Amino acid sequence: MNIPSDRFMIPCHLMGPHFSPCAASEKTGIQFYKQTEVGEIEHIGKRKEIAKVGHASFEPPLEFQQTENPYIGLFWMIDTLTEHIDTLRSCGADDIWIDLGVVSHLDVKLEFEPDFLMKLANLKIPFLISGYIETADE
């Protein structure tokens, strides 16, 4: 496995017109860092709107992100979703996706083992990958 010298950002986003982040968190133990229930007031820029969909986001706990191997957090995310995907869907999460951000000073080569790719494929969710160049002042 090729390990980049920099870091990953690994948020998972969930949403749906009947999705309840509170129920999902209660049933799975997942701690969302951002969540909105259907019907709550949302601040969108300077406007306030009533949320038509429930949505939430979560990331691996810090101990899985702050390691020499940035893949550890990604493995945690896949394992957590594998364990809880049915419960999240039963709580109304119709749309679930992982948005991997790779932050680097240089070019990065990502390498995924077949077992990891099979686990990811079995989730049947989108997996987005974006690259970001970190400059000296960041």
Predicted region positions:
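Acidic (Asp/Glu-rich) sequence patches and key acidic residues
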Residues: 1-138
